[in-house]
Amino acid sequence: MTASDTIARLEAQVARDPQSADGWRALGDAWTARGNMAAADAAYAQSIRAATRDPELLQAANALVAGELAVAEPILRARLKRAPTDVAAIRMLAELASRLGRYGDAEKLLARVLQLAPGFRAARHNYALVLHRQNRAGDALAQIDILAAEEPDNPALANLKAAVLGRIGEYEDALDLYARVLERQPAQPKVWMSYGHALKTVGRQGDAVEAYRRAIALEPGMGEVWWSLANLKRVTFDAADIAAMQGALEQDDLSADDRFHLHFALGKALEDAGDYAASFAHYAQGNAQRRAMVRYDPDEIATHVTRSAALFTPAFFAARQGYGCPTPDPIFILGMPRAGSTLIEQILASHSLVEGTMELPDLPQIAARLGGRKLRSQDSAYPEILADLSAQECAALGEEYLERTRIQRKTDAPFFIDKMPNNFLHIGLIRLILPKAKIIDARRHPLACCFSNFKQHFARGQAFSYDLAELGGYCLGYTQAMAHFDAVQPGAVHRVFYEAVVDDLEGEVRRLLGFLGLPFEEACLNYHASERAVRTASSEQVRQPIFREGLNQWRHYQEWLGPLKAALGPALVDYPFAT
């Protein structure tokens, strides 16, 4: 049978049965083999429409909605083994990869979808989102513009574009875009929520609360909005709010995403009300549900610390004197999340010579690329691969980091801050490729810090934080990693204890600026008056003078923190400030 005969047969088949996803997909494959990509795209588009009635794909889709990723994945992989060009299934597998934070895998899958079916608009939207989450703003905006050419008034596209603009610090443009969309189409709860996020970032708390409330009025069960209100830290829920959240949890059709967000929000509401037992129960449920949705190997941190300690010795660094890019611009603030890094950033960003940015993903992405791991089951070549890098390669990597982060710099200040906390995993890389960069370790009492993590739902990353024992193990690994670098590179890392800052703000600020080689400026003590945008969970706390309340909030919950204390072990014993 000739290719033309095959196409004629398949066209006759789909004419008889237009709901056959397999028939349309086979026709798309046939047109692809003939090189007629326009006809293939049209056939794949019909396959996508027909697939919405496919029982197998519906089962996978329902599992994704319910957050049952372990159920969805084998269905989709079996499907693609039989039909490798099923673009609907490939797109769903990409969604699964994205949910797991495997954005590189998701990107490859979506690129394949768009190669087969360039007119698959939902896949292109997913592609833009994945590019955005990998900090590739220019590429994401290019995909959004392709979609917007046909749908200029699509609120979902405008919402994503505004989020991308906000990610690169173009906050006013993002706010203007949100406002224009909502003026035309006010019944958009997700856009109101995103607008609230942007308003919070620039310090317009009252407007953010109003935007979040507009979203709730449109969709009362939208868990992320309730959590966003709770996450403002300075909003107190009333009895009606608590009843509304409890009522939403009773809905049978509530999504897994809405459900765990509501548990976190109710945990905060009941904590503020002083009902600590009920509060902890909700925090525990929210964390357990979120933990079931993420992949995390608690042994990875200990393995990484052991491998790093074996590699990064005094002899290793002595043999590489003069390696790397000598630019002194970056200031890395790292450590555990919720340890005071945003406070340190706000203090330093109030200095005339320092620009604050955000938690930049560029260094971990460079490390991941060096590791070369394609599958989670594979071993990473990182950090040992660093021993093979030449002086020129180290300099090139330092220059790459500076180029990648340039889009975040909006002023002519000579220094800028990267406050990705997890960069403590990459101190060896920093010292190798950016030897003149400064490194600051933000510390807070392990129980206060870890329980603050447990109460916090992170939009992405920090998968270690959803189980008390795993959280303690991660914190222990962090302290061991820092102790190693203190031993092999004394003085390379400046440590700032949150408790010391509370006790003596000016003294700690002067010591910090001295480490950075910067003159003292009074503005650093009045950091809370800064109008700069702040994107992290501590955004509202750093807009007020320093407070002591956060030091002992964990004590209300200490009867439930046994697994955390046991896992922390020596990290708890060795902390220099008493509880």
Give short role names for the model-derived ranges.
Residues 168, 202, 211, 216, ...:
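PAPS-dependent sulfotransferase catalytic domain
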